[in-house]
């Protein structure tokens, strides 16, 4: 049938003057970011200007047992990455960080996001002699930067020049022989923050990664900002700041980020509770208990309960060893994982009118299965409330929903969806309310709901064309 959307990637970097286990700290930080990608991961370490690394398919704990982590050795800088494939197939070659050697040195790069002009850039680079080894748009970014590096005095100048050419969503952590650099696209589609650890600096997709290694949160990287950590301290280039309206993906607050993270000044946990409160105002119902679908539906359920006065109940036990269904790359894998992911607590549900809170309905498969579990546990009624508007359009900025064909809301009305998933009523959060989730009240990308994107998007399935590379011309 239909299922849920998934996360993209998580990035991390650390700069230390020495005496710090940068590989071990990166390992710990990637554990904290594991929710952002579960297909592959990698760590690259810089030891006195020599960059080496390891990456593979699997979870952080699987790819880096103690002996593998020890082989990475010591160093002063490191970058790490957890990946879910949004552009480029699932393969070891597409795992990150990418390590690039060029005439002026070397570079390791980790990327969260998705380019909208990757196909055009790749074609131009290949015509100029570039040889690609992956089907990931991250390699396009890396080669664009190295191309600019040939005619600029520094790596940060090369990055700034590359930003004039690459379009779309990108939060980057780049490691050169002497510097660690954080980059956020001018729209700020994906989060990126700065932390302080002793006399060193760290960059991460979410603040929870800083907490996991004992680093102090300093601030978020501004949209369009380039932040450089080196022996001189921390400095930034703001040439591209303020060029575009801020457009953080609103799904970072709804689903992607961990609830204990703070993104652009707003706590994710609080934002999700606000979503639940708005839902209670927009879609009230007579019921006996409010239950959240683990994990991202739990905070919204608390908000709905507080606003409505309907008691909150724990209705599910989650198998913590099962990966998030939204992050499973294949539909068959999603369905299998749902079957063993959740179990109901029947004493909370039996004979009661249940308000079931979930973060989204994209394809519908996961939701339908969860509703079936609640029915089988003896619910008298099931009323679904969703802490996001209907998902009506593809995402071009880092989630794996590139076609309207797979979106249940595109081909069915809300009453029809309610019938398909088996609920007595169904209510979605309004687009107006979803833009008010964050306390900071800043701008969001809501293109997946409204069809209005902050930047020009490809008219065709550029992702598929990109992954085929030059084969169309052969």
Positions of predicted regions on the chain:
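PRPP-dependent phosphoribosyltransferase catalytic core
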Residues: 163, 178-179, 196, 214-220, ...
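Short, glycine/charge-rich flexible loops or terminal/linker lids adjacent to PRPP-binding catalytic cores
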Residues: 309-354, 365, 392-402
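Conserved short alpha-helical segments that host acidic/polar catalytic motifs at enzyme active sites
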Residues: 1-223, 228-287, 293, 381
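A conserved beta-strand->alpha-helix junction
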Residues: 134, 139-142, 312-323, 420-438
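A glycine-rich phosphate-binding loop feature that marks nucleotide/adenosyl-phosphate handling sites
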Residues: 46-49, 177-179, 292-300, 307, ...
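Flexible loop/turn segments at secondary-structure boundaries
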Residues: 86-87, 117, 189-190, 210-211, ...
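Extended, hydrophobic alpha-helical segments in both membrane/secreted and soluble proteins
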Residues: 290, 297-304, 308, 312, ...
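Secondary-structure transition/capping motifs at alpha-helix termini
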Residues: 130, 151-152, 284-288, 306-313, ...
